[in-house]
UniProtKB/Swiss-Prot annotation:
Organism: Mycobacterium sp. (strain JLS)
Any one GO molecular function term: structural constituent of ribosome
PTM notes: One or more lysine residues are methylated.
Purpose: Forms part of the ribosomal stalk which helps the ribosome interact with GTP-bound translation factors.
Protein name as catalogued: Large ribosomal subunit protein uL11
Classification via SMART domains: RL11
GO terms under cellular component: cytosolic large ribosomal subunit
Encoding gene, per UniProt annotation: rplK
Swiss-Prot/TrEMBL GO biological process terms: translation
Keyword Phosphoprotein recorded: no
Length: 142
């Protein structure tokens, strides 16, 4: 078995699916770790091609020899809620001004999508986490 490579950095970014390019914020974040920026952009865009229109968080592990691996996460709950509610952004005063409504079915659907990234044992707990996010954005859950 080959010896393990030493990890020198972990970079977390949220990039539009299929639209990674060397411009900020991607270029500077990767450049300071010595990663080949174009190589990452091509690999990320190829991996997220099917999810265009969503913001996909990515965790990039950089190794000593400047090679890297990356893991894709599920889209942020806030973005999924905004899409489900059909509004461009959440409320500036979430507990006073409500901007939209979502149903429990929509919340459960988002919880199903996010289950792998959430710290929940079952779908009901995951749905409550998503409902809390919705509440903090001024979206009513019915």
């Amino acid at each position: 078995m080959a010896p393990k490579k030493k990890v020198t950095g972990l970079i977390k970014l949220q990039i539009q699916a299929g639209q990674a390019n060397p411009a900020p914020p991607v270029g500077p974040a990767l450049g300071q770790h010595g990663v080949n920026i174009m190589e990452f952009c091509k690999a990320y865009n190829a991996a997220t091609e099917s999810q265009r229109g969503n913001v996909i968080p990515v965790e990039i592990t950089v190794y000593e020899d400047r090679s890297f691996t990356f893991a894709l996460k599920t889209p942020p709950a806030a973005k999924l809620l905004l899409k489900a509610a059909g509004v461009p952004k959440g409320s500036g005063e979430p507990h006073k001004t409500k901007v939209a409504k979502v149903t429990w079915d929509q919340v459960r659907e988002i919880a199903e999508t996010k289950k792998s990234d959430l710290n929940a044992n079952d779908i009901d707990q995951a749905a409550k986490i998503i409902a809390g996010t919705a509440r903090s954005m001024g979206i009513t859950v019915e």
